Swiss-Prot record:
The keyword Oxidoreductase does not apply. ATP binds at G38, P39, N40, G41, S42, G43, K44, T45. The gene is ydbJ. It holds the Pfam family ABC_tran. This is Uncharacterized ABC transporter ATP-binding protein YdbJ. PANTHER family: ABC TRANSPORTER, ATP-BINDING PROTEIN. Belongs to the ABC transporter superfamily. Residues 6-234 form the ABC transporter domain. Keywords: ATP-binding, Nucleotide-binding, Transport. GO terms for molecular function: ATP binding; ATP hydrolysis activity.
Length: 308
């Protein structure tokens, strides 16, 4: 079995007496895009800062590309590229000069690699312009180029689409998807935007109050449903019949949600009608990421101060 690029186990962080992160554990595999989703103040940024070495955890471990954070920090960081909100550059230098300056901090980054990443992020025509003339979207693309210049195995993104218009956000997503597919880069994408996660990620980890509340796979969400919503009367009689016939069913908002393959819905409908039940509709049931997010966060709702 392949080893994860990022492995976090039992991570705790306190500031003073306040618990900021509580027993965080996760894996990110090669070529996988993982969304770290949570409201502002959920602990996402604190976790990102620990991963990139800007903060120290109280307990737990971080392993990147097989290197322990605590004992082999420099080797671990060689495998990391990061964009934290809006990337900063020297505005009086060109995009190329900024990348060249960054490349000089690493070993053996040839100009051919600079050309490659510039083309990948779509900045070829503007790379020799001064960065002060760049739009926010162009700066973000330059940020991606800088972050992947040294071929990191792990790319960390913390709210990277802040301030981008819809076209810029789509452009950004396309570049990240291509990066994961073409170079096998593992991506951890922290955001509070549901739509961004749905459009970009393979899997989402929902975090609130410093704890992981749920993990949801976003792959295969268009497959045939295994649940249906039934509007039927009398509802209690229908529910009793379903559970008595080995169906997994429950009442929900005046309807019944039942586990049933799509191809078996006509047979189920005939059976219900045969029990003198009035069936008004049977529709496929799909639970959106928004539903999952609300379910995970409201089920653990607590009073207290916000995290950072």
């Amino acid at each position: 079995m392949a080893e994860p690029i990022l492995h976090i186990e039992g991570l705790d962080k306190k500031i003073g007496s306040k618990q900021i992160l509580k027993q965080i554990s996760m894996d990110v595999m090669e070529g996988e895009i993982i969304g770290l989703l949570g409201p502002n103040g959920s602990g996402k940024t604190t976790l990102i800062r620990i991963i990139v070495g800007l903060l120290k955890q109280n307990s737990g471990s971080v392993t990147i590309s097989g290197f322990q954070h605590d004992t082999e920090f420099e080797k671990a960081m060689e495998a990391v590229g990061a964009i934290v909100e809006n990337p900063e550059f020297y505005p009086y230098l060109t995009g190329w000069e900024n990348l060249k300056h960054f490349a000089n901090m690493h070993k053996k980054i040839a100009d051919e690699r600079l050309d490659e990443v510039v083309e990948r992020v779509g900045l070829t025509s503007a790379i020799h312009d001064k960065v002060k003339t760049y739009s926010l979207g162009m700066r973000q693309r330059l940020g991606i180029a800088q972050a992947i210049l040294h071929r990191p195995k792990l790319l960390i993104l913390d709210e990277p689409t802040n301030g981008l218009d819809p076209a810029g956000m789509k452009d950004f997503r396309d570049h990240i998807k291509e990066l994961a597919e073409m170079e096998g880069t593992a991506v951890l994408f922290a955001t509070h935007l549901l739509r961004e996660v749905e459009d970009l990620c393979d899997r989402v980890i929902i975090i609130q109050k410093g704890e992981i509340k749920a993990e949801v796979s976003l792959q295969g969400t268009d497959q045939t449903t295994e649940k249906a919503i039934i509007e039927v009367q009398p509802q209690e009689k229908a529910l009793n019949w379903l559970t008595g016939n080995q169906y997994q069913a429950e009442s929900q908002d005046g309807t019944i949600v039942v586990e049933v393959a799509k191809e078996n819905i006509p047979e189920l409908n005939r059976s219900l009608v045969g029990q003198d039940l009035n069936v008004f509709s049977i529709t496929p049931y799909t639970q959106s990421l928004e539903d999952e997010f609300i379910k995970a966060t409201t089920a653990h709702q607590e009073e207290g101060e916000e995290l950072v």
